[in-house]
Regions:
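Short phosphate-coordinating micro-motif centered on Lys-Gly-acidic
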Residues: 39-51
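Cyclic nucleotide-binding regulatory module and flanking cytosolic helices
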Residues: 1-41, 81, 86-87, 91-94
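Short, small/polar residue-rich loop motifs at catalytic or cofactor-binding pockets
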Residues: 32-33, 51-53
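Cyclic-nucleotide recognition modules
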Residues: 77-135
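A cytosolic small-molecule/anion-sensing beta-strand core signal
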Residues: 41, 60-61, 82, 107
Length: 229
């Protein structure tokens, strides 16, 4: 159980709440609670892909494994999410209010959850929160637009690194994608042989690691840097 002082310090550091005055934040907290819940490491997802998104969920501390399985079932991605952050705030509203990924606590984690109704009735009344929320949604939209850029005219290497960057737009550390070589070649519109050769070259440069039907990128930041050279 954390003290009120510790709780206030925690709230002021959370995305979307930064910049809200102490008085306004104290009022919001007194109305909707914003209790900190702790969860130990788990072997199964705490939140599963396609679960309804009914709350705004702040991951305040700790790390979670984030996993996604494509709709066609041909590939799966895996990355690490580090608090403080928010779990898919863009899926709280819209036509399909469901989580796109599964989330499994990798270590002790803590959460603050706010019901959608309380977001609308209380948090949205704070101008700073609205500005922060709209800015976050805009950033997500811009990243998704970048993912849709055509890949025609690119080399095989550029197609592979571009695909990885589109899949892991908000990641800087280690990520993984489980996919068969043939399926990857089809995704980028190349032959299996050219795809395999290029992956081996990237591995020789220590940009990726290859295992059976698995590509590991130890550092996404390094891959982005090499892609710009």
């Amino acid at each position: 159980m954390i003290s009120l002082t510790q709780k206030y310090e925690l709230l002021t550091k959370l995305p979307l709440l930064q910049g809200i005055s102490g008085k306004e934040l104290a009022h919001i907290e007194s109305v909707i609670g914003m209790e900190v819940n702790e969860v130990p490491p788990m072997s199964r997802p705490l939140i599963r892909q396609n679960d309804p998104c009914t709350h705004l969920i702040f991951l305040t501390t700790g790390k979670m494994i984030r996993q996604y399985k494509s709709d066609d079932g041909l590939y799966q991605t895996k990355s690490i999410l580090q608090g403080p952050t928010i779990l898919e705030p863009h899926n709280l509203y819209g036509l399909n209010c469901r989580f796109r990924c599964s989330y499994t606590p990798l270590q002790d984690v803590s959460f603050i959850t706010v019901r959608k109704r309380d977001v609308m009735q209380h948090l949205m009344k704070a101008e700073i929160f609205r500005i922060n929320y709209f800015n976050m949604l805009s950033a997500i939209i811009h990243k998704k637009e970048a993912q849709l850029q055509p890949v025609q005219g690119l080399t095989v290497r550029q197609k592979i690194t571009s695909l990885l960057q589109r899949l892991f737009t908000d990641c800087s550390g280690q990520v993984e994608i489980a996919i068969k070589m043939t399926d990857l070649a089809n995704y980028i519109g190349e032959t299996r042989l050219n795809t395999s050769r290029t992956l081996n070259q990237l591995e020789e440069e220590n940009i990726i690691e290859l295992k059976r039907s698995l590509i590991i990128v130890p550092e996404m930041d390094k891959l982005r840097m090499k892609s710009e050279e």
